[in-house]
Regions:
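Extended active-site neighborhood of metal-dependent phosphoesterases/phosphodiesterases
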Residues: 97-226, 313-348
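Active-site neighborhood of phospho(di)ester-bond hydrolases with catalytic His/Asp-centered motifs
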Residues: 51-53, 80-85, 114-119, 253-254, ...
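Active-site environment of divalent metal-dependent phosphoester hydrolases
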Residues: 58-59, 88-90, 118-127, 199-203, ...
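N-terminal active-site segment of His-dependent metallophosphoesterases
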Residues: 40-98, 247
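N-terminal secretory signal peptides that target proteins for export/translocation
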Residues: 1-15
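Bacterial N-terminal signal peptides
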Residues: 20-31
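A short C-terminal boundary segment appended to hydrolase-like catalytic domains
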Residues: 345-374
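His/acidic metal-ligating clusters that form di-metal
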Residues: 72-79, 108, 191, 207-312
Length: 374
């Protein structure tokens, strides 16, 4: 996301140190055995993963992101979930050379496996003049060939440069959309659809939105509708797997903030989200969360400030606006740092605890902004 809703001061106020560590209660406590997608399933036990997104952005991000990577590599996490946007939407060019450079200069620097969902800045927004004026679909093809699947059909793994995690994480990919991934690991099912910001690449008619995004170039309903249907099918399949495996919880990774709040847009600086473009994915998440009954965690980036909330409300199985209907207590959303706020979140997962998810914020000392006293 590149049209920020909040000022820097407002964003900093949103981060309250009192909430740096918090737990979200599970709806059901039991003992579960992980059903990994490889032949050798491992018993589930407490472990940690890193949650990051929206980096490296611009010169500041290029300088600060290595500090984040170094902290993650020095930690005891098992893997990293990256919620997209490897470049800024306001100036980083979508050149052919940019993508392999990100592979070697960013993704390959992580010691443990990294799982990545595609952001809008990598392809949807590449038609903007400031990003080079490229055809978005040509950039999407480069994202796929550099980060997900080679021309010979071989799937690409990210991170794991030290080979320190067993290869038993058997990752499933959709045949038509290689970026759609799914796997089971230590009692948790991970589902990765492809849901970027900038209205999910749908054709948006709002004049202010189109002005912000270089007029009529924006959006492709043919691409959007096909991928949207694939996303819904993938989410359904992932939850079916979670139920069959007896998973203690489900984690879903997307890039876009899918506008759970439903508030009005600022016409002077229109936001990248469009509620209608995410409706089918959100409904699929609701339907499956209600059926699954156990804890579900949605991770997204896009906004660049850290936040944990329970944004899902429903009436008769349909989504309703926040604070209306009934709160879906087994659905939690975590939004990661990013852009000018280059820090990371540790998710501690304990399949045997009534508190399945515990969030621990890691503020990278070298990346702190200097604030003058008033």
């Amino acid at each position: 996301m590149n049209a920020a809703r909040m000022t820097t001061t407002q964003k900093l106020k949103r981060f309250n140190p009192l909430f740096a560590i918090l737990t979200i209660g599970a709806m059901t406590a039991a003992l579960f055995i992980a059903a990994d997608s490889s032949a050798n399933a491992a018993q589930s036990y407490k472990y940690s993963i890193a949650l990051i997104g929206d980096m490296p952005y611009d010169a500041k991000g290029v300088t600060q992101t290595p500090n984040v990577i170094n902290e993650i590599n020095a930690s005891r996490i098992d893997l990293t979930l990256f919620d997209g946007d490897t470049m800024s939407g306001k100036g980083d060019k979508c050149t052919d050379a940019a993508y392999p450079a990100l592979k070697t200069g960013f993704f390959d620097k992580f010691f443990k496996p990294l799982f990545y969902t595609i952001g809008d800045n990598e392809w949807v927004d590449c038609d903007r003049a400031v990003k080079g004026g490229f055809d978005p679909l040509s950039r999407l093809a480069l994202v796929r060939s550099n980060f997900f699947q080679k021309a010979d059909g071989t799937y690409i793994t990210l991170g794991n440069s030290m080979g320190t995690t067993p290869s038993r994480i058997g990752v499933m990919h959709d045949s038509a959309y290689p970026e759609l991934q799914m796997f089971s690991y230590k009692g948790i099912t991970y589902i990765i659809p492809h849901v970027p910001g900038s209205a999910n690449n749908s054709a948006v008619a709002t004049p202010t939105f189109k002005t912000y995004n270089d007029a009529a170039k924006d959006g492709d309903d043919v691409e959007y509708k096909a991928r949207d249907a694939a996303n819904v099918a993938w989410i359904n399949k992932g939850f079916e797997k979670a139920i069959a495996d007896g998973s203690a919880g489900v984690i879903v990774l997307v890039q876009a903030n899918m506008d759970w709040e439903g508030y009005a847009r600022d016409a002077a600086a229109p936001n990248n989200e469009n509620t209608a473009a995410f409706a089918n994915v959100k409904q699929a998440l609701l339907t499956n969360t209600l059926k699954f009954k156990k804890p579900v965690l949605l991770q997204n980036g896009d906004e660049h400030w850290y936040q944990v909330d329970m944004p899902m409300n429903e009436t008769a199985g349909k989504l309703v606006e926040k604070d209306k209907g009934s709160l879906v207590e087994n659905f939690t959303r975590v939004q990661t740092f990013g852009s000018g706020f280059n820090h990371w979140v540790e998710l501690i997962i304990d399949p045997h605890s009534t508190n399945l998810w515990t969030f621990k914020v890691h503020i990278v000392k070298e990346n702190l902004d200097v604030h003058a006293a008033s």
